[in-house]
Amino acid sequence: MSSLKKILGLKGKGKKSKKLGIAPPPYEEDTSMEYAPSAPIDKSYFGVDEMDTHDPNQLRYEKFFFTVKMTVRSNRPFRTYSDVAAAVSHWDHMYIGMAGKRPFYKILAFLGSSNLKATPAVLADQGQPEYHAHCEGRAYLPHRMGKTPPMLNVPEHFRRPFNIGLYKGTIELTMTIYDDESLEAAPMIWDHFNSSKFSDFREKALMFGLIVEKKASGAWVLDSVSHFK
């Protein structure tokens, strides 16, 4: 977790990252990525004696580098951004990947969808509509999801079909996100969105399984991730 001083670009003396460079689990590991215990975790279990307790009211800041490359192929042109979001939000159906990065990947998929541009028809594969987006940079995310695991510089690729109403096609996503431990200031991740595509930000975020709330300052905060999307 990046401290607020690092987010704002303020130097601190003797401040070291608490994150460990632990290798991520194998990408091919086929296991359930959803875990929601119904009772307090027994502290006698291995590895939980020093586990960070998740306080849903505690605001944290995560600073990172990111890259997202997206290609969407559809059987017909999308009419509105709502059509785009309905299709792209299925990218993590039957998700197999790094569990700790999934909430951040949801944000990057949402971000990429807002920056999609249509490929000229003459260049489209077999004459079918294609859309592309490529976004990268540095950003920070205010959130209430508890302590996040170390995020290493490991790209992941996803390819999923979609069949939503009149639209059928495929989504291809390559995403990379890793910790930024520098002292340089960074913009909020929401600043990288093309907000001209939509006005109902909270509703569109929920389509990607992101539950966001607005602070008194007007900034959006990721409160949690929906288990139903």
UniProtKB/Swiss-Prot annotation:
Chain location of the short sequence motif PTAP/PSAP motif per the record: 37-40
InterPro entries: Vesiculo_matrix, VSV_matrix_sf
Cellular component terms per the entry's GO annotation: host cell cytoplasm; host cell nuclear membrane; membrane; viral envelope
Bias kind Low complexity: ranges: 1-10
PTM info: Phosphorylated by host.
Biotechnology: VSV is used as an oncolytic agent for cancer therapy, because of his wide host range, rapid replication and mild pathogenicity in humans. VSV used are mutated at M51R in their matrix protein. These mutated viruses cannot successfully infect normal cells, being unable to counteract the antiviral state induced by interferon-alpha in normal cells. Cancer cells are impeded with responsiveness to interferon, and then can be successfully infected and lysed by the virus.
Motif, PPXY motif: chain positions: 24-27
Pfam families in alphabetical order: Vesiculo_matrix
Residues spanned by motif dynamin binding: 2-4
Keyword Phosphoprotein among UniProt keywords: yes
Gene Ontology terms describing biological process: symbiont-mediated suppression of host mRNA export from nucleus; symbiont-mediated suppression of host transcription initiation from RNA polymerase II promoter; viral budding via host ESCRT complex
Top-rank lineage group of the source organism: Viruses
Keywords from the named record: Apoptosis, Eukaryotic host gene expression shutoff by virus, Host cytoplasm, Host gene expression shutoff by virus, Host membrane, Host mRNA suppression by virus, Host nucleus, Host-virus interaction, Inhibition of host mRNA nuclear export by virus, Membrane, Phosphoprotein, Viral budding, Viral budding via the host ESCRT complexes, Viral matrix protein, Viral release from host cell, Virion
Gene Ontology molecular function terms on file: structural constituent of virion
Membrane topology: Peripheral membrane protein
Record region (Disordered): 1-23
Subcellular location: Virion; Host endomembrane system; Host nucleus membrane; Host nucleus
Main location: virion
Family that this chain belongs to: Belongs to the vesiculoviruses matrix protein family.
Oligomeric and partner information: Homomultimer. Interacts with viral nucleocapsid; this interaction contributes to the virion assembly. Interacts with the viral envelope glycoprotein; this interaction contributes to the virion assembly. Interacts with host RAE1-NUP98 complex. Interacts with host NEDD4 and TSG101. Interacts with host dynamin. Interacts with host NDUFAF4; the interaction inhibits viral propagation and is independent of interferon activation. Interacts with host GTF2H5; the interaction may inhibit host transcription.
Described function: Forms a double layer around the helical nucleocapsid, the inner matrix layer binding to the N helix and the outer matrix layer binding to the envelope glycoprotein. Plays a major role in assembly and budding of virion, by recruiting cellular partners of the ESCRT complexes that play a key role in releasing the budding particle from the host membrane. Condensates the ribonucleocapsid core during virus assembly.
UniProt note: domains: Late-budding domains (L domains) are short sequence motifs essential for viral particle budding. They recruit proteins of the host ESCRT machinery (Endosomal Sorting Complex Required for Transport) or ESCRT-associated proteins. M contains two overlapping L domains: a PPXY motif which interacts with the WW domain 3 of NEDD4 and a PTAP/PSAP motif, which interacts with the UEV domain of TSG101.
Protein name, as recorded: Matrix protein
Gene name of this polypeptide: M
